[in-house]
């Protein structure tokens, strides 16, 4: 899972980089592994800054001063399979045709065939293990078919038809053609989110933004916004004070199935994705979870409800209200430690849990505690939290998950774990409780979770992580290749890759 952002300003003399930086901070929760930014200045010249680390560390004042131009894109990377190196920070760039930069959120599930096609048929060199580079080169190859001196909107839309035809998976992309435009597009199933917004300036001109979540748009006064539809694309001209953005339904919508895990965990609660309030869904999750708790544990056996900060707070508070039990903030969070399941290895995840959360003993001592978290993935965080609760004096610990049991790979951009590393893999709920060291584990049912999120327009979601049935299907050998690449990256973590990838356009990459 990643955060992507693109901004085109009407004032051609203005500098977009500071606003891209601010927007990146609003999307930092979507990717803490690497950050990158590319801008377009006069005569179509591109400028870039990217590297491993948080946005505030990568985008230093010295580097930002070199990012000129009124149009640009940004990316926050969450480490998926094949993307742990500094050289794999995005945006990616190809100089031919026309000079293209691309930021990609999601994962392609037919990478084996795409890599062969790019090598054997169109003879494009792929320099990294990232599927984002594959997607960019498929688009570049399709655009090159036109063999024209200058590109136009129809050429871009036709090239995107080729991308949709060849690329399978969940993806949302923001790209930039040097000196010409921004563009954005979304996969035909709407698995990954992408929103478009506009902001009216005092002189009547308009600025435009593309972003992964609505919270970025609202924070920057892009108050008129909407979701791109599945299979839809938009082109925003660089000189957007003279030309309007153009939208086109490039391919028909296959289905409208946003990833359910966005609402459970990944998105900020103050975002609205596909017309669905993340905060509202989490309130509903708390109500449904309370009903599931009652089926497993007598409420009289619970003295207090405790949340695991931060994502589970909304759900836990509502759960406590419906159980008529006191709610307590019994874990204090260190906000300078990243999300634990994003950590690159097990040892780091275990130590990170204790650095991240500190229990207040008096909230646990001699109490029977229901702990509510958004999900249980590997069980690393859950097990340590349960241990801390018992060390602090809890007499019984029940553990409730706002999500159903996760027993399968997430293949569309949230690199949770290999299937066999998931604590619920090949285990019953009682066996999970035994593994975690608590009295009972209570999972939300999938049916209830869907009910919490659905609307009149969207009543189905991508739920493969819970069921093993993926909306796009996967090519033969993909899951095995995914696990092979993960294992390879794990082995390479001790051997640093090249610090900077090859790129002649890196004028601002110091």
Swiss-Prot record:
Reactions catalysed, semicolon-separated, are: 5-phospho-beta-D-ribosylamine + L-glutamate + diphosphate = 5-phospho-alpha-D-ribose 1-diphosphate + L-glutamine + H2O
Task: Please list the coiled coil stretches.
Answer: none
EC nos: 2.4.2.14
Catalytic site: 2
Q: Residues in domain Glutamine amidotransferase type-2?
A: 2-239
Q: Which GO terms describe its biological process?
A: 'de novo' IMP biosynthetic process; purine nucleobase biosynthetic process
- Any Pfam family hit: GATase_6
Q: Which cofactor does it need?
A: Mg(2+)
Keyword Transferase set for record = yes
Cite the entry's keywords alphabetically. Glutamine amidotransferase, Glycosyltransferase, Magnesium, Metal-binding, Purine biosynthesis, Transferase
Is the Transferase keyword given for this protein? Answer: yes
- Give the co-factor note: Binds 1 Mg(2+) ion per subunit.
The protein's annotated pathway: Purine metabolism; IMP biosynthesis via de novo pathway; N(1)-(5-phospho-D-ribosyl)glycinamide from 5-phospho-alpha-D-ribose 1-diphosphate: step 1/2
The GO molecular function terms of this record are: amidophosphoribosyltransferase activity; metal ion binding
Q: Where does Mg(2+) bind?
A: 373-374
Identify the PANTHER family for this entry: AMIDOPHOSPHORIBOSYLTRANSFERASE
What family is this?
A: In the C-terminal section; belongs to the purine/pyrimidine phosphoribosyltransferase family.
Q: Which NCBIfam families match?
A: purF
Question: What is this protein called in UniProt?
Answer: Amidophosphoribosyltransferase
Originating species: Lachancea kluyveri (Yeast)
């Amino acid at each position: 899972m990643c955060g992507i952002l693109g901004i085109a300003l009407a004032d051609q003399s203005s500098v977009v980089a500071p606003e891209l930086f601010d927007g990146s901070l609003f999307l930092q929760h979507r990717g803490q592994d690497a950050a990158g930014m590319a801008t377009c200045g006069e005569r179509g010249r591109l400028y870039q800054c990217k590297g491993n680390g948080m946005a505030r560390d990568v985008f230093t004042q010295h580097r930002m001063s070199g990012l000129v131009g009124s149009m640009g894109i940004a990316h926050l990377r969450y480490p998926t399979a094949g993307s742990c190196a500094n050289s794999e920070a995005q945006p990616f760039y190809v100089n031919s045709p026309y000079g293209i930069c691309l930021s990609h959120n999601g994962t392609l599930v037919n990478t084996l065939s795409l890599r062969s096609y790019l090598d054997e048929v169109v003879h494009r060199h792929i320099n990294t293990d990232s599927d984002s580079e594959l997607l960019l080169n498929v688009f570049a190859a399709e655009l090159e078919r036109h063999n024209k001196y200058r590109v136009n909107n129809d050429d871009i839309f036709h090239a995107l038809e080729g991308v949709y035809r060849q690329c399978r998976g969940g993806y949302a992309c923001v790209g930039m053609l040097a000196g010409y435009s921004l563009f954005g597009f979304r996969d035909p199933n709407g698995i990954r989110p992408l929103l478009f917004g506009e902001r009216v300036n005092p002189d009547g001109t308009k600025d435009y933004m593309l972003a992964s979540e609505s919270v970025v748009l609202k924070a920057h006064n892009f108050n008129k916004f909407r979701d791109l539809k599945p299979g839809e694309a938009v082109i925003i001209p660089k000189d957007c004070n003279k030309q309007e953005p153009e939208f086109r339904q490039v391919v028909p919508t296959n289905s409208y199935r946003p990833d359910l895990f966005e609402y459970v965990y990944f998105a900020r609660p103050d975002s609205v994705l596909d017309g669905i309030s993340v905060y509202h869904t989490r309130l509903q999750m708390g109500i449904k979870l309370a009903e599931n708790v009652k089926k497993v544990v007598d409420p009289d056996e619970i003295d207090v409800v405790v949340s695991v900060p931060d994502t589970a707070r909304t759900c836990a508070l509502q759960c406590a209200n419906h159980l008529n039990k006191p709610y307590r903030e019994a874990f204090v969070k260190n906000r300078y430690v990243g999300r634990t399941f994003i950590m690159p290895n097990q040892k780091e995840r275990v130590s990170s849990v204790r650095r991240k959360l500190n229990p207040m003993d008096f909230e646990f001592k001699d109490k029977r505690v229901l702990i509510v978290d958004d999900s249980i993935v590997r069980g690393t965080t859950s097990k340590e939290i349960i241990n801390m609760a018992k060390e602090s004096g809890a007499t019984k610990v029940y553990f409730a998950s706002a999500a159903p049991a996760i027993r399968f790979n997430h293949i569309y951009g949230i690199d949770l774990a290999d299937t066999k590393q998931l604590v619920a893999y090949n285990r019953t709920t009682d066996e999970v409780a035994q593994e975690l060291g608590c009295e009972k584990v209570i999972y939300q049912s999938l049916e209830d979770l869907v009910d919490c999120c659905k609307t009149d327009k969207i009543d189905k979601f991508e739920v493969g992580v819970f069921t093993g049935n993926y909306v796009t299907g996967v090519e033969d050998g993909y899951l095995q290749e995914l696990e092979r690449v993960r294992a390879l990256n794990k082995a390479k973590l001790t051997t640093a890759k090249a610090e900077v990838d090859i790129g002649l356009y890196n004028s601002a990459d110091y």
